[in-house]
Design a protein with these regions (language model features):
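Sec-dependent N-terminal signal peptides
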Residues: 4-13
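N-terminal signal peptide c-region/cleavage motif recognized by signal peptidases
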Residues: 14-18
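Short acidic, Pro/Gly- and aromatic-enriched capping/linker segments at domain boundaries
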Residues: 20-25, 257-277
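Polysaccharide-binding surfaces and accessory modules of carbohydrate-active proteins
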Residues: 21-28, 33-36, 44-254, 270
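Glycine-rich, histidine-containing beta strand-loop boundary motifs that form or position
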Residues: 32, 39, 152, 165-168, ...
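Short Pro-Gly-centered flexible turn/kink motifs
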Residues: 99-106, 274-293
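Terminal connector regions
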Residues: 142, 286-320, 327
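Aromatic-lined carbohydrate-binding/catalytic grooves of carbohydrate-active enzymes
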Residues: 314-453
């Protein structure tokens, strides 16, 4: 009996030590900002902190939340449908065998400094506890700019295809007494209207379902002022986020019964199911975060610095001042009118002239918005000597020359639409939807890609 008790006691002690073992700390930091995750002994990966820099995040290994797992409100780093998660998930899939549950468990993490010593990349690897589905959370920290970007990589190792229903780029839990959400909305001729909303319990979404573009109706970016119901450019704690994605997007803000705010950010799940074949990976868009104790101005300056250094092509080059032909001439111009505009631009010390809409189309001249779009030949009636003549004239006056195109769109009244009706995006057995007298070209068609690019 004593021989039997010894291994039983040893096994019980081992299990007790394992259950009480501290969580692994995953520290992602810049000069002034820290994002801290922990991996629990059971494999769950939690978000523990995003805000001001923590020089020693080790104590977070012993963090104990008052939020209970049986309430489905734990601060999982990438919550999925299934298990005890009852909130909107960052990941919702149907596995190859029809199973709709996913419970991600920690595998490993690693950080490395990139060739640019200012940039550190951290990859957290997780896998489903029962299915051959892997998720990597990739965090890139920009030290001087105090910006951290993140995206997810989903890999299918199952025997059949997996259907992705929701695949957000990021899930970010925050704890504060108050949350003031600031974002931009608008419409034509009144873009970038500022909206301030004090978040209460429940969910609020900022989203677009306008397909291939972000819009002036809603922007995929936000500011969150913490612990205050007043907005300030100069003081207060502020988190800023922006999604690097030009299609349908969704930013969801959910305040639960414990006053914890979870921000889900990424591609809009609406009509976005993706079939991931065995062996394939899917990479979500990048989500960009920063934090400031100096109000919205501090957060926006962090993003400005990051954009100039990393986010914008030739970000440190001076942008030329320019005159665009649109507001001055609309569709009604010829070479004489354009030359006069170039002369005026040069006399004012401007640096570039841009020829806007109306320069193309012959069978269907682009004299209004109803015709010619897609027929990218120079309109011989307006510009008999061609665009080269206008560009050379601009150069002779010391100006750069630019030109406007909208290659993804086509007018129904155009040679392109007549010759290639199969290039138009249209639902089966239905007419192609028309917006602003335009149809959309199918950019997934290789022939369209060759034409456009």
């Amino acid at each position: 009996m004593k021989k039997l008790l010894i291994p039983l006691i040893a096994a019980f002690a081992a299990n007790t030590v394992s259950a009480a073992a501290p969580q692994q700390v995953i520290d992602i930091s810049t000069d002034k900002v820290s994002m801290v995750l922990t991996a629990a002994p059971g494999g769950e990966v939690y978000f523990r902190h995003f805000g001001g820099r923590i020089d020693d995040p080790a104590p977070l290994a012993d963090y104990k939340s008052n939020r209970r797992s049986d309430h489905g409100t734990e601060d999982l780093a990438y919550p999925a449908t299934g298990g005890r998660n009852f909130r909107e998930p960052a990941l919702r899939v149907t596995h190859a065998d029809g199973d709709m549950n996913t419970e991600l468990r920690y595998v490993s993490h690693a950080s490395k400094q990139l060739s640019d010593k200012n940039v550190t990349e951290t990859v957290v690897k997780m896998t489903d506890c029962c299915q051959a589905l892997d998720v990597e959370l990739v965090f890139t920290a920009y030290a001087r700019e105090n910006v951290i970007t993140t995206h997810a990589v989903i890999r299918n190792r199952e025997k059949g295809p997996v259907t992705l229903h929701s695949f957000y780029s990021s899930s970010l839990p925050l704890k504060a007494d108050k949350y003031l959400l600031t974002h931009l909305y608008g419409a034509w001729a009144r873009e970038a209207q500022v909206d301030h909303t004090l978040l209460t319990h429940g969910s609020k979404s900022i989203e677009s379902t306008r397909e291939v573009r972000t819009t002036h109706t809603e922007n995929p970016a936000f500011l969150l002022t913490l612990n205050s119901d007043s907005f300030s450019e100069t003081c207060g704690e502020v988190i800023a986020g922006a999604l690097a994605w030009s299609g349908n997007f969704r930013l969801n803000f959910e305040v639960d019964e414990f006053d914890v705010l979870t921000v889900l950010a990424g591609a809009n799940p609406n009509a976005s199911e993706y079939r991931l074949r065995p062996g394939e990976t899917f990479t979500t868009p990048e989500m960009i975060y920063t934090h400031s104790f100096c109000g919205a101005g501090g957060a926006s300056r962090n993003l400005h610095d990051w954009a100039r250094n990393y986010g914008v092509y030739h970000g440190h080059e001076a942008v030329p001042t320019l005159l665009n032909s649109w507001e001055g001439a609309y569709f009604k111009f010829d070479a004489k009118v354009l030359k006069q505009m170039i002369d005026d631009a040069a006399s004012m010390g401007l640096e570039m002239f841009v020829l806007d809409d109306g320069w193309f189309g012959n069978k269907y001249p682009r004299n209004n918005s109803n015709a010619g779009l897609g027929d990218w030949q120079v309109n011989a009636a307006k510009l008999p000597e061609g665009i080269d003549h206008i560009a050379s004239y601009a150069h002779s006056k010391g100006l750069k020359f630019g030109i406007w195109i909208e290659p993804e769109m086509v007018n129904p009244k155009s040679e392109l639409a007549e010759k290639h009706p199969d290039w138009i995006v249209r639902p089966p057995k239905r007419e192609a939807p028309t917006t602003r007298n335009q149809w959309l070209l199918d950019l997934t068609n290789p022939k369209v890609q060759d034409f456009v690019f």
